[in-house]
A protein has these predicted regions:
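Intracellular juxtamembrane helix-capping segments at the cytosolic ends
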Residues: 115-128, 136
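Extracytoplasmic
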Residues: 11-45, 49, 62-66, 150-151
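Helix-loop-helix hairpin linking two adjacent transmembrane segments in secondary transporters
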Residues: 138-190
């Protein structure tokens, strides 16, 4: 049975895109709440940006580490692990009383968030051959959908309850959306299909090299 570019491949892409849209908010949340934490902790803008800086450091490190975990344990277990890390981080962030503790927590949130970017993109790419380019582009856009969709949803919570409740909403969304969706990604591509994919990738690389030489 054909696995590449199949109906299931597109279904899997849709699920992965939903996971990415929820999972990647860990990168954007601190940007959304930045004015509020600046005001509450009475700090300047440069100090208030420390949580975002450490989020990106955690995100960069997490892409490599989470990628290795995917290689060993599969995408479902990796997403569940990342969801647990982020949920604990969100709940802990609700309790902090200074920007430095928040920054440390955002490092771990960024680390967990990484599972919803590079590793998820790589896993999705295995299910496509002819349409791999558009599939990778679509799943990568989950990061930006996250940054576009969630901020407007948080406006009322920020105005009425404050930034801590935003973290509470994210903790609930991560547990009740990401984890259930991850179980729909448990199926692994067959070794035969994987070999076909690897052979096609190798041929593309050789063609590119020959083109450069010519």
């Amino acid at each position: 049975m054909k696995e590449h570019d199949s109906l299931y491949s597109w279904f899997r892409l849709l699920i992965a895109l939903l996971v990415a849209t929820v999972g990647n908010i860990g990168m954007w949340v601190v940007v959304i709440i930045l004015p509020d934490i600046q005001q509450e902790f009475t700090i300047d803008r440069s100090t208030a940006s420390i949580p975002f800086a450490l989020t990106m450091v955690g995100f960069a490190i997490g892409n490599g580490v989470m990628g290795r975990i995917v290689d060993h344990y599969g995408i479902t277990k990796t997403i569940i692990l990342a969801a647990i890390i982020n949920t604990v981080g969100y709940i802990a962030a609700m309790q902090v009383n200074n920007v430095y503790l928040l920054s440390i927590l955002q490092f771990f949130i960024g680390f967990g968030t990484a599972a919803s970017f590079g590793p998820l993109i790589a896993d999705t790419s295995h299910w496509f051959l002819k349409r791999r380019g558009i599939a990778v582009a679509l799943i990568a856009s989950g990061n930006y959908f996250s940054g576009a969709i969630w901020p407007p949803l948080f406006n009322s919570a920020l105005q009425s309850d404050g930034w801590r409740d935003v973290y509470g909403i994210l903790a609930l969304a991560t547990i009740f959306i990401m984890i259930p969706l991850s179980f729909l990604l448990t199926k692994k591509i067959s070794e035969e299909t994987s070999r076909v994919s690897d052979a096609a990738s190798l041929k593309t690389q050789k063609d590119l090299l020959m083109g450069k030489r010519n």
